[in-house]
């Protein structure tokens, strides 16, 4: 009997610029991947994408994405408010824990809103094992569905002497 792979379920995609990135469909797999990369010392050069339904929507639909209302999108003030709370109180804090950087506060943040979508940008610098790196998280909610896109990117940072 074959042993089950307990690692995160991920799809690897190459974008137009030739960059390879991992695409996740569940928040748990995404956080597991970040944690594993941090433990493997591969944390300072990651680019991955998460496309998922937020937990508060899945809870209300009894974990059935088919039951999620079409009205849950970036035009719904209630959806936007709950999504923003989820991102700031759960997603970003969980990323800081996965990166083993409790000082990561994502204090540099901005919001860009159009009719088509809402984008929140979070940036911060951190250091782990004396290796400084920059973390950028872009969270996008669109007007046509409740699926949320998270673009997570870390890049090495050099310290000026």
Curated annotation (Swiss-Prot):
GO terms for cellular component: plasma membrane. Keywords: Cell membrane, Membrane. It is a peripheral membrane protein. It is found in: Cell membrane. InterPro entries: RGI1, RGI1_sf. Its main location: membrane. One of its GO terms (biological process) is energy reserve metabolic process. Disulfide bonds: none annotated. It holds the Pfam family RGI1. Involved in the control of energetic metabolism and significantly contribute to cell fitness, especially under respiratory growth conditions. Belongs to the RGI1 family. This is Respiratory growth induced protein 1. It comes from Zygosaccharomyces rouxii (strain ATCC 2623 / CBS 732 / NBRC 1130 / NCYC 568 / NRRL Y-229). The lineage of its organism: Eukaryota, Fungi, Dikarya, Ascomycota, Saccharomycotina.
């Amino acid at each position: 009997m074959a042993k089950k792979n307990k690692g995160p379920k991920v799809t690897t995609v190459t974008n137009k610029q030739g960059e390879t990135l991992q695409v996740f469909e569940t928040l748990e797999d995404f956080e597991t991947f970040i944690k594993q990369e941090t433990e493997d010392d591969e944390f300072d050069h990651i680019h991955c994408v998460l496309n998922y339904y937020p937990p508060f929507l899945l809870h209300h639909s009894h974990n059935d994405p088919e039951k999620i209302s079409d009205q849950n999108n970036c035009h719904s003030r209630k959806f936007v408010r709950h999504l923003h709370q989820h991102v700031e109180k759960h997603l970003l804090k969980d990323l800081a824990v996965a990166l083993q950087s409790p000082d990561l506060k994502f204090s540099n943040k901005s919001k860009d809103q159009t009719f088509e979508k809402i984008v929140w940008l979070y940036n911060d610098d951190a250091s782990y094992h004396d290796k400084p790196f920059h973390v950028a998280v872009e969270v996008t909610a669109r007007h046509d569905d409740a699926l949320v896109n998270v673009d997570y990117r870390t890049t090495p940072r050099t310290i000026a002497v």
